[in-house]
């Protein structure tokens, strides 16, 4: 390897919002990384799926555009 080409790695502490911390190496100089999810709290790794509220989106769409019936024309020709 060429000298002075690669960045220096620093020991870094990663802190998740769930409270989990672990140490790794990174090029970030201050040695602290904050993460939103980690393997201890991510639904894929824990097996707990979070249910997303899509009902609110449907209601918002129906308020904006109204509820259409099958066969009803939408708008007229200009």
From Swiss-Prot:
GO terms for cellular component: ribonucleoprotein complex; ribosome. One of its GO terms (molecular function) is metal ion binding. Binds 1 zinc ion per subunit. It comes from the Bacteria. Its cofactor is Zn(2+). Gene3D superfamilies: Ribosomal protein L31. Coiled coil: none annotated. It comes from Frankia casuarinae (strain DSM 45818 / CECT 9043 / HFP020203 / CcI3). NCBIfam families: L31, PRK00019.1, PRK00528.1. InterPro entries: Ribosomal_bL28/bL31-like_sf (IPR034704), Ribosomal_bL31 (IPR002150), Ribosomal_bL31_A (IPR027491), Ribosomal_bL31_sf (IPR042105). Keywords: Metal-binding, Ribonucleoprotein, Ribosomal protein, RNA-binding, rRNA-binding, Zinc. The keyword Nucleotide-binding does not apply. Binds the 23S rRNA. This is Large ribosomal subunit protein bL31. The keyword Signal does not apply. Zn(2+) binds at residues 16, 18, 38, 41. Transmembrane segments: none annotated. Belongs to the bacterial ribosomal protein bL31 family. Type A subfamily. Part of the 50S ribosomal subunit. PROSITE patterns: RIBOSOMAL_L31 (PS01143).
């Amino acid at each position: 390897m060429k000298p002075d080409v690669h960045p220096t790695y620093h020991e870094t502490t990663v802190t998740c919002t769930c409270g989990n911390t672990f140490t790794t190496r990174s090029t970030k100089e201050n040695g602290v990384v904050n993460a939103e999810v980690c393997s201890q709290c991510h639904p894929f790794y824990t097996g707990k799926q979070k249910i997303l509220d899509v009902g609110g989106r449907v209601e918002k769409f129906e308020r904006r555009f109204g509820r259409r019936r099958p066969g009803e024309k939408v708008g007229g020709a200009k």
